[in-house]
Design a protein with these regions (language model features):
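N-terminal accessory beta-strand-rich subdomains and adjacent acidic, glycine-rich linkers
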Residues: 4-268
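An acidic-aromatic substrate-binding cleft motif
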Residues: 239-308
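Generic detector of bulky aromatic hydrophobic side chains
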Residues: 10, 20, 106-108, 287-293, ...
Length: 309
């Protein structure tokens, strides 16, 4: 039988509606109108699909209102205020949804004794209209996604509708969708560790984006610019080999009513794992002007500068 769960933002403007039937889907609702929806699942090597024919064991809701110290950021502290819903499923996995006043995030979790191999993660972000976007393609026009995975992530943003985007080229995050009336939703990710970064590609003829992940490297060789890069020559048939008990990357959606809210949003900072650097007394924040690029050199110092050791 279908089951429905929901969690709202602290100010009640944004809501996530989760539907559990033969698969798991969720919708983001703002001001009683659906912004987007998606099916979510994670396929393990061997064929097990986390999210297929799911059986809910427990749903836990919590409210958090705390501050995160941010000594090297544009703010001294970051306010972390959200409502969270954790759904635990039979099979030792779960989904976590967080709803902030300025957006939504979700992630998979697993609790297994042995390491697991992830074949793929499903995410298909469907929009109700063919909205305009601000999209950065990979800076490669090569014909296959395999060839496009190797890129510098340096590309201007194109302002095109979802269906007007080139579906033969991968898109990089963050990607911004213009919902009209000044509202926008920014798709990005956070707390990405031991997992490939997410690309997006538009579904042909549909106002939707599908997640694409680079498979894990099997064979690498040194090459590229000045022989400074490791080039992938062959890939495995999975995207990650990782700990069986872990939280996976957050898939985040920043929702703004005007553009200045985007500039002031701290969502990626909030979603990051706590710093593992215990002693930060030696870190002195300041400005740097590409010291690693401009001749790799320093001047006026009492030692021989440069790449010489």
């Amino acid at each position: 039988a279908q089951k429905n769960y929901q969690v709202q933002s602290p100010n009640r403007d944004i809501k996530v509606e989760v539907t559990v039937a033969d698969k798991v889907t969720f919708a983001i609702v703002q001001d009683h109108s659906e912004v987007m929806n998606s099916a979510v699942s994670m396929t393990l090597q061997g064929g097990e699909v986390l999210g297929a024919n799911p059986k809910v064991l427990k749903v836990t809701k919590t409210s958090v209102d705390k501050e995160i110290p941010s000594p090297f950021y544009k703010k001294d502290v970051v306010k972390d205020i959200y409502n969270e819903m954790q759904i635990s499923f039979r099979g030792n996995y779960g989904l976590v949804f967080r709803v902030y006043n300025d957006g939504v995030a979700y992630r998979f979790t697993t609790k297994r004794k042995e390491p697991i191999v992830i074949a793929d993660e499903e995410a298909v972000y469907n929009f109700p209209s063919d909205y305009k976007t601000f999209t950065a393609y990979v800076n490669s026009t090569k014909p296959t996604f395999e060839e496009q995975f190797f890129n510098s992530f340096e590309q201007p943003y194109a302002n095109e509708t979802i269906t007007g985007l080139n579906d033969k080229r991968l898109k990089i995050l963050p990607l911004l969708v213009d919902l009209g009336d000044g509202r926008k939703i920014c798709i990005t990710e956070a707390d990405l560790e031991d997992f490939p970064g997410m690309f997006l590609n538009n579904e042909t003829g549909k106002p939707s984006f599908k997640a694409v992940h680079a498979p894990y490297p099997k064979v690498k060789e040194q090459g590229g610019h000045n022989q400074l890069q490791m080039l992938v020559k062959e890939r495995e048939n999975y995207i990650a080999k990782t700990s069986g008990t872990r939280s996976f990357p957050w898939r985040a959606f920043i929702i703004s009513r005007n553009d200045k809210e985007l500039a002031d949003c701290d969502m990626v900072y909030r979603l990051a794992s706590p710093s593992r650097v215990n002693d930060i007394s030696w870190i002195k924040p300041g400005k740097v002007a590409w010291d690693w690029w401009n001749d790799w050199n320093l001047y006026g110092v009492d030692f021989r500068a440069g790449i010489n050791n």
